[in-house]
Every structure is written in structure tokens, then in C-alpha cells.
Swiss-Prot record:
Species the sequence originates in: Clostridium botulinum (strain Hall / ATCC 3502 / NCTC 13319 / Type A)
GO cellular component: cytosol
Subunit field text: Heterotetramer of two alpha and two beta chains arranged as a dimer of alpha/beta heterodimers.
Protein name: S-adenosylmethionine decarboxylase proenzyme
Site, Cleavage (non-hydrolytic): residue positions: 62-63
The EC number(s) this enzyme carries: 4.1.1.50
Cofactors (names): pyruvate
């Protein structure tokens, strides 16, 4: 069976408040993640909420990577969507563990656009 896209939904719980509020760090971490996945960034958008929180999007040649933070809830939501299954979710979690402080991770893998 063939699919148009592969969507990885990552929820991180028990995140470090100070790290979530460091938007420069989160932006660099997101860009490094894109490079680690061997994707090309073609556009980016970032927004800092007040008093806290952050959303960011990288449009990559293969689709997109987004992040949303809720420091007050110690939570990060990350979505990675690509037109091919070109990455291993275990490697992404290992990368996140190396670069972010969190207590729990939940991952959902979704196959999108079934082609008959």
C-alpha cells in the first residue's frame, strides 16, 4: 500500500520551563532537527506569545516541521510531516532527549493520503 505522506505527532510532557522560554534555543534546536533529518529548509516562521509560549514552523522541501510550547503546562507539541518515510522516529526521540529536558514522550505515527 502506498501513501502520500507520513505524519509524526510528538507530545512532550514535564518539560523544563526555563528551556521552553528560551526561544533562541528552541529555534536553533528546531533547525538542527531539520538538518539531522537531512531536509532542506525553504521557509520559516516563529512567534513568541506573551506572557509565555512559542510557536514555530519550518517549511521543508519534503513538507513541514512545527513546534508549539506551553511553558505553563510544561508541554511541547511537535509535528513532522513529510511526503516520504525518510526518518526513523526512534532517532528523532533520541535527538529530542539530547536537546530538551522532559519526563514523558508520546508519539503517534499517521500514514496520510492512501493511494489505491
Amino acid at each position: 500500500m502506498k501513501y502520500s505522506g507520513y505524519h509524526l505527532v510528538i507530545d512532550l510532557f514535564g518539560c523544563n520551563f526555563d528551556q521552553l522560554e528560551n526561544t533562541e534555543y528552541i529555534i536553533e534546536m528546531l533547525k538542527k532537527l531539520a538538518r539531522a533529518l537531512d531536509t532542506k529548509i525553504v521557509a520559516k516562521a516563529f512567534h513568541k506569545f506573551h506572557p509565555q509560549g512559542f510557536s514555530g514552523a519550518l517549511i521543508i522541501s519534503e513538507s513541514h516541521i512545527t513546534i508549539h510550547t506551553w511553558p505553563e503546562d510544561a508541554y511541547i507539541g511537535i509535528d513532522i510531516f513529510t511526503c516520504s518515510k525518510c526518518f526513523d522516529p526512534r532517532k528523532i526521540v533520541a535527538y529530542l532527549k539530547e536537546n530538551l529536558i522532559f519526563k514523558k514522550v508520546e508519539i503517534k505515527e499517521i500514514l496520510r493520503g492512501k493511494i489505491d
